[in-house]
Amino acid sequence: MESNTNSQGQGIIPQSYHSSIFFSISKGSDKIGGLLEYLEIIKKHNINITRIESRPSKTEKKDYDFFLDLEYPTENNKEVEKVIKDLEEKGVKATTLQESSNQTYAPWFPRKISDLDLFANKVLEMGSDLTSDHPGASDPVYRERRREIAKIASTYKHGDEIPRIDYTEEEIKTWGVVYNRLKELFPTNACHQHAYIFPLLEQNCGYSPDNIPQLQDISNFLQECTGWRIRPVQGLLSARDFLNGLAFRVFHATQYIRHPSVPLYTPEPDCCHELLGHVPLLADPDFADFSQEIGLASIGASDEDIQLLSTCYWFTVEFGLCKEGDTIRAYGAGILSSTGEMEHFLTDKAKKLPFNPFDACNTEYPITTFQPLYYVAESFQKAKEQMRQFADSFKKPFSIRYNPYTQSIEILDNKDKLLNICNDIRNQSEILADAISKLKA
């Protein structure tokens, strides 16, 4: 999973921390003069402002709302607290979101899909960093190739065309070995959603034993199916950053491939895992909603809750099983991309329990051996409802919703925003009622 930490400390990029401050200025006041005064307060505390946005407020007072993104080099939030205090002394009520273990604040999170650019390159492990026990650790050609592909991913920004990789003959051969072996097992081991979508990927995205599909083609296909998109990444992201991406229906995927010496094994996610394991299910509407539900639960969650969510992700999206009549099939990418795991989960050695996030979140799991325990979902729809109930147990100072039109996270912190949701529900209900009446006619 994309949440592993780097115990060797390799490839870790220097960390910076973020806050977002929200405040309003009265329409009748000197907007420009007032804003400059408040910016000077922030500057005084040696905090960088990375973005400023303004818009007419939706409150009855018709104020101007300002949104400031801040960046600072230390996790210590004392200076941010001083900024809030100084603003309050000026009669300005400011709200902040920031990366902090202080429970007074909610951790910072991306508000727009383009905000994913802020952390996309802050990987825990670079794609070019290989531990001594990695199959390609002593292969200089392979290591250089990993560095090359990681560098390509590092240049990507939201809205760009995903760079296409010119895969070598050896890389395509490795892909083909994995592809052919897994495809033999899919009919008897994979869930019916995977079985339905995989041929569509072959038809629309160039999936075949002789071709490694390009992320841009896959992303285009997913956007048409479920609104999901793929974003290239250099290596392993933190659990928080990876899960936050899911809230925007964005899946961070690697483009490099495992070492050819052991084509049926990889110690970390590679393009075989991402494209053969994860991608097919992201084209299924119910699974797409379920995955986003996990992402939305991570928005503003505490470090402790992020760990619980990561574990639930492991037992669902990575190693989840589901019921299909009297049989049990796999939907987790860690199973669907591993020949050994696909054969193992059907044996008596593997214990299977009904999926319950309140139980799964506290279950330990191995990362280097076959899973001794799997959780079985009744359906993706029910699993989504269970995850929503689980997320409701998290203590957050606000509620949120994802706006698919603006691809942004909205904080539901005033009456007008709630009324907007009510209007949306009413409009959708009217459309539904009209459709039902025409079906009955």
Curated annotation (Swiss-Prot):
One Pfam match: Biopterin_H
Record note on temperature dependence: Optimum temperature is 40 degrees Celsius (in vitro, with the purified enzyme).
Bound cofactor: record note: Binds 1 Fe(2+) ion.
Catalysed reaction, written as an equation: (6R)-L-erythro-5,6,7,8-tetrahydrobiopterin + L-phenylalanine + O2 = (4aS,6R)-4a-hydroxy-L-erythro-5,6,7,8-tetrahydrobiopterin + L-tyrosine; (6R)-L-erythro-5,6,7,8-tetrahydrobiopterin + L-tryptophan + O2 = 5-hydroxy-L-tryptophan + (4aS,6R)-4a-hydroxy-L-erythro-5,6,7,8-tetrahydrobiopterin
Gene3D superfamilies registered for this protein in UniProt: Aromatic amino acid hydroxylase (1.10.800.10)
Keywords in alphabetical order: Iron, Metal-binding, Monooxygenase, Oxidoreductase, Phenylalanine catabolism
Superkingdom of the organism of origin: Eukaryota
Entry-linked InterPro entries: ACT-like_dom_sf (IPR045865), ACT_dom (IPR002912), ArAA_hydroxylase (IPR001273), ArAA_hydroxylase_Fe/CU_BS (IPR018301), ArAA_hydroxylase_sf (IPR036951), Aro-AA_hydroxylase_C_sf (IPR036329), Aromatic-AA_hydroxylase_C (IPR019774), Euk_PheOH_cat (IPR041912)
Keyword Cytoplasm: no
Quaternary structure, from the entry: Homotetramer.
Alphabetical list of PANTHER family matching this protein: AROMATIC AMINO ACID HYDROXYLASE, PHENYLALANINE-4-HYDROXYLASE
Assigned protein family: Belongs to the biopterin-dependent aromatic amino acid hydroxylase family.
Biological role: Catalyzes the hydroxylation of L-phenylalanine. Hydroxylates L-tryptophan to 5-hydroxy-L-tryptophan but does not hydroxylate L-tyrosine to L-DOPA. It uses D-threo-tetrahydrodictyopterin (DH4), also known as dictyoperin, as a cofactor.
Anything else known: This enzyme uses tetrahydrodictyopterin (DH4), a D-threo isomer of biopterin, and not tetrahydrobiopterin (TH4) for it's catalytic activity.
Descriptive protein name: Phenylalanine-4-hydroxylase
Lineage of source species: Eukaryota, Amoebozoa, Evosea, Eumycetozoa, Dictyostelia
